[in-house]
Regions:
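Class I SAM-dependent transferase core
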Residues: 2-89, 93, 123-140, 248-249
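Short alpha-helix immediately C-terminal to the canonical SAM-binding loop
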Residues: 124-126, 196, 200
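SAM/dcSAM-binding transferase cores
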Residues: 203-263
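Conserved beta-strand signature within the Rossmann-like core of class I S-adenosyl-L-methionine
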Residues: 185-195
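Short loop/edge segments at beta-strand edges and connector loops
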Residues: 37, 144-146, 216-218
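Conserved SAM/SAH cofactor-binding pocket of Class I
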Residues: 74-169, 175-176
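Helix-to-beta-strand junctions that scaffold the AdoMet/dcAdoMet cofactor pocket
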Residues: 110, 182-184
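Short "lid" loop at the C-terminus of a central beta-strand within the Rossmann-like core
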Residues: 148, 193-197, 222
């Protein structure tokens, strides 16, 4: 188990839009991560666009800034503090990116990363395209595909140093959706909550079926969210994933790998 990352940052009172960049900077500094100096301003503009677009389409359940500061932006960026996890100029795919988390904040904070945002809904990608253009992010590409289909596509299969996901799927499911995208020597990175412990053994068995090695867990403490149990689990890619994985769309969720007595 790794070192607990992050530390508290004071102040939870409501803030005006003009104060967003300062609050973001304070939060980023509390994480003790390296980030591009323009990151706070760009994340503030990202949040403004998210708030506007969310009025006409369901991108996220809550656009309150104080909630989003911890649960979206700092949560997305906290793993940058894990030594060696995000190498310089790494290629990264965010699978099932939704409103862009965690991939777009990572691309904003680390312009050296080559980032692909993949999602199955075109309307979400339309929003992300608008944000990427507004922020001038030349290190971001968009892909319209389901994870299972993308993981079998030779354009994307085993093409990335990192595959990340912040969804609510169980660890064995995330292993099957992410590891096919990862080069041998790279890692899948899963953002997980309290369920991580109970999913650990099945996740490890699933990872081995997919060419993965021993799972690595790092607890995370987010500024202002000290009561939120959170961790990052890295799945190293040791061998190529056999051709049968990922299985067809929907199957990983219905029949997760790594279950006792299962596949």
């Amino acid at each position: 188990m790794g070192e607990v990352l992050g530390r508290a940052v004071s102040g939870t009172e409501a803030v005006s839009r003009e104060q967003w960049p300062e609050r973001l900077k304070n939060g980023l500094d509390a994480l003790n991560i390296r980030y591009d100096p323009a990151t706070p301003e760009r994340l503030a503009r990202y949040h403004q666009l998210l708030t506007e677009w969310n009025q006409v389409m369901n991108l996220t359940g809550d656009t309150d800034f104080e909630t989003s500061l911890g649960r979206h932006y700092l949560d997305s960026l906290a793993p940058l503090g894990i030594e060696g996890l995000f190498p310089e100029s790494a290629s990264l795919i965010d699978v099932g990116t939704g409103a862009g988390f965690p991939g777009l904040p990572l691309a904003i904070a680390r312009p050296d990363l080559d980032v692909v945002l993949m999602d199955s809904l075109q309307k979400r990608l339309n929003f992300l395209d608008a944000v990427v253009k507004e922020l001038g992010r030349s290190n971001v590409r968009l892909c319209h595909a389901r994870a299972e289909d993308g993981g079998r596509d030779p354009r994307w299969r085993e093409q990335f140093d990192l595959a990340v996901a912040r969804g609510v799927a169980a660890l064995p499911v995330l292993a099957e959706l992410l590891l096919p995208f990862v080069k041998v020597g790279g890692k899948a990175v899963c953002y997980k909550g309290p369920a991580a412990s109970e999913e650990w053994d099945a996740g490890q068995r699933a990872a081995r079926l997919l060419g993965g090695g021993k799972l690595e867990r790092t607890p995370i403490v987010l500024p202002g969210q000290e009561d939120w149990e959170h961790c990052v689990i890295a799945l190293p890619k040791k061998e190529k994933t056999v051709r049968q994985y990922p299985r067809k769309a929907g199957t990983p969720g219905r029949e997760p790998l790594g279950q006792t007595g299962g596949k």
